[in-house]
Amino acid sequence: MTSPAKFKKDKEIIAEYDTQVKEIRAQLTEQMKCLDQQCELRVQLLQDLQDFFRKKAEIEMDYSRNLEKLAEHFLAKTRSTKDQQFKKDQNVLSPVNCWNLLLNQVKWESRDHTTLSDIYLNNIIPRFVQVSEDSGRLFKKSKEVGQQLQDDLMKVLNELYSVMKTYHMYNADSISAQSKLKEAEKQEEKQIGKSVKQEDRQTPCSPDSTANVRIEEKHVRRSSVKKIEKMKEKHQAKYTENKLKAIKAQNEYLLALEATNASVFKYYIHDLSDLIDQCCDLGYHASLNRALRTFLSAELNLEQSKHEGLDAIENAVENLDATSDKQRLMEMYNNVFCPPMKFEFQPHMGDMASQLCAQQPVQSELVQRCQQLQSRLSTLKIENEEVKKTMEATLQTIQDIVTVEDFDVSDCFQYSNSMESVKSTVSETFMSKPSIAKRRANQQETEQFYFTVRECYGF
């Protein structure tokens, strides 16, 4: 036999509901705290961005001034009146052209960094200030909207509580009325059963006395039955009335329950999401995007300007050419480097001879001297060929040393999480002391040998 179902008492149901509502209320409070924290973090972030770019603007301006001082220091030397024409002539030489472009690049970098500092101070920082003001103002309004949404939700929960209590009350009345009706029905059945038993137990008597007794008993039974019937009808009417109220209250409770669940779902799934991205974050990310893109535009244009200057310097570096510079130098100072006039034969005391005299007795001497010169030239030619090969090999060695492609320092900019790797990379570059000392010693030794050969055998 199955045990009867256990029903929760009203107090248990109310307690569970109160607990659930308290949890929701606590959640709502934490939601506002969370949004407050987000607002504080946002304000702090925007303030940090302002301070960062303000400090960066100062650094850029200081850097610009230092670059300007650097350029002006050397440009002032170039503009000095001493040897002005010589300096002007030197400008056509490729190394001097590189130097001038380098100074111009520094000047342009100085101007660009001044512009960058101005953009930070008068464009980017005001944008962050505006974003901060807008964000604070919108958050304040969003908080008011969120508070109103939470108040509306709590109002719905309170209404559900009231409807639920009404349902419990009417349902309890209905159950009570039903119980009384059943009790009345039992009494009616019991009364009817008594009447039947009494009729069965009656013994035969005289006709007159029997008739009187029966009439009296019937009257009593009818009176009792009528009372019970009236009581039953009264309980039936009360039960019907309470049952109707209970059904209506139950319907109201179910409708309110459905509406409450829909309101809770709407608040948590839609309202909260809309509150954050359509109220609290309204325009925040877009405005921040514009401010940071202004920074990117400034930095990229600075980089583009620098690249243009570096491209000009790179072009000048590629045009570094010793042969062309030698030709330009000789053309500029033609009077210095042009060959002098030939020495002419100066006749003495009217002597007009201007050619060798190959007559006897000097002919044989001239022939012998010519043979000696030819023999000597053959020997020198062989020696010079060997010396030439040695000089060419030595010169090639020097050129290999001075043209080695050791200028790529890209590895120095491959940073990792550990600064030790950076230091290690830098220490292994061309400028490390052991490496450069060895290179310099090798180069100087080769140069010394080369010029020794030149001095011994001439050019």
Swiss-Prot record:
The entry's cellular-component GO terms read: cytoplasm; glutamatergic synapse
Question: What's the effect of swapping residue 235 to R?
Answer: Does not improve solubility
Every F-BAR domain range: 22-325
Q: Which GO terms describe its molecular function?
A: protein heterodimerization activity; protein homodimerization activity
Stretches with biased composition (Basic and acidic residues):
181-202
Which key words are in the record? Coiled coil, Neurogenesis
Chain coiled-coil ranges: 363-401
User: Annotated region Disordered: where?
Assistant: 181-211
Q: Name one GO biological process term.
A: negative regulation of cell migration
Q: Which domain of life is it from?
A: Eukaryota
User: PROSITE patterns under this entry?
Assistant: F_BAR
The reply on keyword Disulfide bond is no
Expression across tissues is:
Ubiquitously expressed with higher expression in cerebellum. Probably expressed in fetal and adult neurons (at protein level).
The answer to whether keyword Coiled coil applies is yes
Q: Which InterPro entries match?
A: AH/BAR_dom_sf (IPR027267), F_BAR (IPR031160), FCH_dom (IPR001060), SLIT-ROBO_RhoGAP (IPR051627)
Query: Quaternary form?
Result: Homodimer. Interacts (via F-BAR domain) with SRGAP2/SRGAP2A (via F-BAR domain); formation of the heterodimer inhibits SRGAP2/SRGAP2A function.
Q: What is known of its domains?
A: SRGAP2C is truncated at its C-terminus compared to SRGAP2/SRGAP2A. It only contains an extended F-BAR domain that lacks the last C-terminal 49 amino acids of SRGAP2/SRGAP2A, which are replaced with seven unique C-terminal amino acids. In addition, SRGAP2C acquired a series of unique nonsynonymous base pair mutations selectively targeting five arginine residues compared to SRGAP2B. This truncation and these specific arginine mutations reduce solubility of SRGAP2C and increase its ability to heterodimerize with SRGAP2/SRGAP2A to form an insoluble complex.
Q: What does this protein do?
A: Human-specific protein that acts as a key modifier of cortical connectivity in the human brain. Acts by inhibiting the functions of ancestral paralog SRGAP2/SRGAP2A, a postsynaptic protein that regulates excitatory and inhibitory synapse maturation and density in cortical pyramidal neurons. SRGAP2C is unstable but is able to heterodimerize with SRGAP2/SRGAP2A, thereby reducing SRGAP2/SRGAP2A levels through proteasome-dependent degradation.
Give the free-text miscellaneous remark of the entry. This is one of the 3 duplications of the ancestral gene SRGAP2/SRGAP2A which has undergone human-specific segmental gene duplications. The appearance of SRGAP2C in the human genome is estimated to 2,4 million years and corresponds to the beginning of neocortex expansion in human evolution. The emergence of SRGAP2C at the birth of the Homo lineage probably contributed to the evolution of specific structural and functional features of cortical circuits in the human cortex.
- PANTHER family per the UniProt record, alphabetical: SLIT-ROBO RHO GTPASE ACTIVATING PROTEIN (PTHR14166)
Identify this protein by name: SLIT-ROBO Rho GTPase-activating protein 2C
Species annotation: Homo sapiens
